């Protein structure tokens, strides 16, 4: 593994589509969200003072162990450039900067009402398959589900707070915010921006045929279609399945679309 970068950001915002595109480059390895962020957090916790043997660890050892986690996980990967995907990485920017000084983070974002809409659409599409997103619960309404995912520890609320932390934090110069709306409407523009951001030669991608299928994982999670990417990259306007009052609750949350709220050094494309 010669280069490591990260894909993070909001759910239902194009991270799997972006990974599917990056995979077209034979030099790159990318995929859906993986286990490394969870393993990383578990290791950090176990090396803390709550473990009585932590007295044998200093920060230099901790850093070597954490780097070793990535080296071990990707030891069988022949790609020259690896992109590890997880929504948790935005909250780990200080650690990433210290462990991997050359690593960049791509944060995929989307207007919040459409993130909530996308999740609800999946639920309604799979009415006979309760989703792991809601602990396989069969009850609730569109309102309770939206409140659940938008909560501070929810599937959307947690990553949203982490995104804001990354965008306004000291490491924002190594962060590229990629808007789903631009990715689907102008994929060439997005990919060129990414190649420039990570300092790699541009590759000509096939935007007319993008495939990435992890059906087994999605079905096990009770949410078929959660990560499936097929066909051409294109914007597909549609009506929302959210009630108007619920949709309007989130319309002003896309801070990255307001120039006066974008701090110096943060790139948004």
Protein language model regions, located:
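Glycine-rich phosphate-binding loop used to anchor ATP phosphates in small-molecule kinases
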Residues: 69-95
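Short aromatic-enriched loop/helix-cap "lid" or pocket-rim segments at secondary-structure transitions
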Residues: 41-46, 96, 117-121, 128, ...
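Conserved phosphate-donor/acceptor-positioning beta-strand/loop module used by diverse small-molecule
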Residues: 85-88, 96-122
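PAPS/PAP-binding and catalytic site of the sulfotransferase fold
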Residues: 14-28, 96-100, 120, 177-202
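Short beta-strand segments
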Residues: 7-9, 82-85, 107-109, 177-179
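PAPS-dependent sulfotransferase catalytic domain
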Residues: 60-76, 117-197
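PAPS-dependent sulfotransferase catalytic core
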Residues: 1-69, 76, 124, 213-221, ...
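PAPS-dependent sulfotransferases, especially Golgi type II membrane carbohydrate sulfotransferases
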Residues: 1-5, 149-169, 173, 188-189, ...
């Amino acid at each position: 593994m010669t280069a490591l970068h990260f894909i993070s950001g909001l759910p239902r915002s194009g991270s799997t589509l972006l990974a599917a595109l990056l995979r077209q480059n034979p030099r790159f390895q990318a995929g859906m969200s993986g286990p490394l962020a969870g393993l990383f957090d578990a290791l950090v916790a176990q090396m803390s003072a709550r473990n009585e043997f932590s007295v044998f660890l200093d920060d230099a050892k901790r850093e070597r162990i954490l780097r070793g986690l990535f080296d071990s996980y990707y030891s069988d990967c022949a790609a020259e450039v690896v992109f590890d995907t997880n929504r948790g990485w935005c909250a780990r920017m200080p650690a990433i900067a210290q462990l991997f000084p050359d690593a960049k983070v791509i944060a995929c974002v989307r207007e919040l009402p459409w993130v909530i809409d996308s999740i609800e659409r999946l639920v309604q599409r799979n009415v006979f398959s309760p989703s792991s997103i809601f602990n396989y619960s069969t009850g609730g309404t569109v309102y309770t589900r939206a409140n659940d995912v938008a909560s501070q520890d929810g599937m959307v609320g947690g990553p949203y707070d982490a995104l804001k932390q990354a965008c306004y934090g000291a490491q924002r110069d190594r962060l590229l915010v990629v808007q789903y709306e631009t990715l689907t409407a102008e994929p060439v523009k997005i990919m060129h921006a990414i190649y420039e951001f990570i300092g790699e030669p541009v590759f000509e991608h096939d935007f007319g045929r993008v495939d990435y299928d992890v059906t087994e994982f999605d079905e096990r999670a009770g949410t078929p279609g959660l990560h499936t990417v097929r066909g051409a990259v294109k914007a597909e306007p549609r009506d929302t399945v959210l009630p108007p009052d619920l949709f309007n609750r989130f319309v002003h949350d896309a801070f990255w679309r307001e120039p006066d709220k974008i701090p110096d050094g943060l790139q948004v494309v």
